[in-house]
Amino acid sequence: MTASATIPKTQYAVQLVGPSELRVNPEKEVFQPGPHQILAKVEAVGLCFSDLKLLKQFKDHARKSEVMKGLSAEILASIPSYVPGEKPTVPGHEVVCRIVAIGDQVKQHTVGERVLVQTDYRNLPTAGSNSAFGYNFEGALQEYVLMDERVVVDASGERFLIPPIVERLPDGA
């Protein structure tokens, strides 16, 4: 693992522990990155309507359910930020953060890099939707967040997934 300055062992985090039940955890563990994982310090996080839906629905939200395919149960068990079903999660999927540690197999990102997160994990379907950062994988309402290297993009936005406009929009649209 490659890391920057001292990383604390615990942090403050907002955790969703049940329907309409948010708690501030002043001693949530700061996870160390595995081989293909990144640990980043959160610089900014936004909340939106989908966070409110998760707050109300909790385990019944389609993106809070278990991954059906794309990763083996063994790999999922090795990811401490994978929290499907009734496990508490950390909401917050709109985030800018700075990488503070990387796993030894991470090749496309470096410590100190500022990144955005691609929320939707389309290659990890659940029973009713797709897995997502801030749902069945912990989000960014915490000081440090652990992520797979494939879900971050550099903050310039040049590699972010923005759908192309294929038709000219009518005037006044």
Residue ranges and their predicted role:
Residues 20-25, 49-51:
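Short N-terminal binding/cap micro-motifs at the start of the first secondary-structure element
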Residues 18-20, 34:
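Residue-level recognition of beta-strand termini and adjacent short loop/turns
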Residues 31-45, 60-121, 138:
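Glycine-rich beta-strand-centered segment in the early N-terminal region that forms part
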Residues 75-86, 118-173:
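NAD(P)H dinucleotide-binding glycine-rich loop of Rossmann-like/cofactor-binding domains
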Residues 1-12:
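Eukaryotic N-terminal low-complexity, Ser/Thr- and Lys/Arg-rich leader segments
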